[in-house]
Regions:
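Iron-sulfur-associated redox domains of electron-transfer enzymes in respiratory
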Residues: 1-165
Length: 165
């Protein structure tokens, strides 16, 4: 059972990022991917074998790219970092975040509430702005099926169970 999260209001996110000059966008290819696949009716994951979790996370990568393009068009410099399960990080993941941080005045987190807390704990001395992009609403049980192309999985909406808190 994963955490079910939805995107926060687009205007709220744009307002929060208004004063940012350089953004580090951290995304998670875990529960956020399934949540975005369900919420936005996007392909979930590539079915091709041999891809790592980030490369196969179609929905979260599509949403991340859309936001990077939007923020870049606003004159922001945006770098991205994918961390697999920031809710339960290894030291190497923490080090990757800390080494990517210099030069960024804003961190945007495209992940669930648990990931936000985990990343926030690492950044306790960070003086910049931290913006959660998603809001966790509960948990989910999803059945994944092949999409129309046969190349991706997608969430079967008819059998989806979302347990809202």
């Amino acid at each position: 059972m994963g955490l079910y999260s939805v995107m926060r209001d687009e205007n709220l996110l744009l307002t929060a990022a208004q004063s940012a000059r350089s953004i580090l966008m951290i995304s998670c290819p875990g529960c956020a991917c399934e949540s975005l696949s369900y919420e936005e009716d996007l392909p979930n994951r590539l079915l091709e074998q041999g891809k790592d979790m980030d490369s196969s996370a179609v929905a979260v990568n599509m949403v991340r790219t859309r936001w990077v393009d939007r923020l870049t068009a606003m004159g922001k410099q945006v770098d991205t970092l994918s961390v697999v399960f920031p809710c339960e990080m290894f030291d190497t993941d923490r080090e990757a975040i800390l080494s990517a941080l210099p030069g960024h005045d804003t961190v945007m987190i495209l992940a669930c509430g648990s990931a936000y807390i985990g990343i926030q704990d690492i950044l306790k001395d960070y003086q910049g702005t931290i913006i959660p992009m998603m809001h966790t609403k509960g948990s989910f049980v999803f059945r994944l099926v092949k999409d129309e192309t046969g190349k991706h999985s997608k969430v079967e909406r008819a059998t989806a169970r979302i347990n809202k808190k």
